[in-house]
Amino acid sequence: MSTHTETPVDGSAETITGAQPYEAGFTESSAGRVYTVTGGDWEQVLGVGEDDGERITVNMGPQHPSTHGVLRLVLEIEGETVTETRLVIGYLHTGIEKSCEYRTWTQAVTFLTRADYLSPLYNEAAYCLSVEKLLGITGEVPERATVIRVLVMELQRIASHLVWLATGGMELGATTGMIFGFREREKILDLLETITGLRMNHAYIRPGGLAQDIPDEVIPEIRAFLDYMPKRIREYHALLTGQPIWKARMVDVNFLDAAACLALGTTGPVLRAAGLPWDLRKTMPYCGYETYEFDVPTALEGDSYARYLVRIEEMGESLKIIEQCLDRLRPGPVMVADKKIAWPSQLAIGSDGMGNSLEYIRKIMGTSMEALIHHFKLVTEGFRVPAGQVYTQIESPRGELGYHVVSDGGTRPFRVHVRDPSFVNLQAVPALTEGGQVADVIVGVASVDPVLGGVDR
């Protein structure tokens, strides 16, 4: 009958009969001993752990609810301290970039809008701006189309930050913040559905302009939202900004200064929370952003709490831009005049809301054979883009979203590469989490706000 020794709290030893032996190779350390977390024996526990150099490797994800998707974190921990963080990605790879090579320039939009599924309009905008540069029609895009692009992008910036607020609040136990965030996001999704026909994956921004004009009836709804949302932002401040538990979990946690951000290539709120006012809408304007009045919120602390404050303030600045967009809306076309590119500019909105105008269908089917042939070839074959390559970057809710688009002169993209900000910003997670507590890993990932659809593509 095998025995082993258990050391009670009072330090005396007694022999326990009937105990099963441990696996071969175990050392006489803390195995089989009973300890308390207070008292004289706790120092002995710490000493044993240090002498043996024991580390535990744990997996956080890819099914963990706090990883914002199918992200796997391999953590090496000593006690409650994270000594090493390794990221494993690729679980959500769908081959979006490669699929674009087998579709026309316009059809590729329907793939790319599914990359970062929380801000699909930004993928559409960055891609279409790239194609327009290759076509040499950047200056020909109608002003109304450009204003509407800015309008819908800023609406989606607020919606994306609201998801970050809701999911981050849920992960830290602030369930009221989760309810508030999704409540306001639902109102924005209703507006985007009225404008584009879909709540997400819109395929609304097209090379040369937009798929369709903005409905007149949505303008009063947007203005009502502009009156409603500032009150809700003040509500978030009242609920969370000064909340002791919220601050205790975020202040001086997951610190990353400006130098580290630049070394790692991080952009967006993570970089601005470290004190650098880098916003492509200001530094490298596109879509006429240089004509809009808004500020770039920054903070100096570089911790998770600073990133929270930056995103909250950005929602207020987006409201300013949206209001200016509504004031600038003037009647006019929303697609370039070149009929060799402007698909589907002639497909006005029909009763089904999906662009099947019976009036235009009757025209091309019954009165103009040439129009029918042109429409058929434009839809099935697509337009040709001159050979060349271009890189376009815009400021998405998560940072710099870049598109490198290459054309060989054909009707399909030769190569489309996405520089997704979530992919780059995730490289900062080890720097944010190593040396901290296990519980702070969740805060660190949430403060980066990654979307795995854009990371894996």
From Swiss-Prot:
GO terms for molecular function: NAD binding; NADH:ubiquinone reductase (non-electrogenic) activity; quinone binding. The keyword Cell cycle does not apply. It is an enzyme of class 7 (translocase). GO terms for cellular component: plasma membrane. HAMAP family: NDH1_NuoD (MF_01358). NDH-1 is composed of 14 different subunits. Subunits NuoB, C, D, E, F, and G constitute the peripheral sector of the complex. This is NADH-quinone oxidoreductase subunit D. It comes from Parafrankia sp. (strain EAN1pec). The lineage of its organism: Bacteria, Bacillati, Actinomycetota, Actinomycetes, Frankiales.
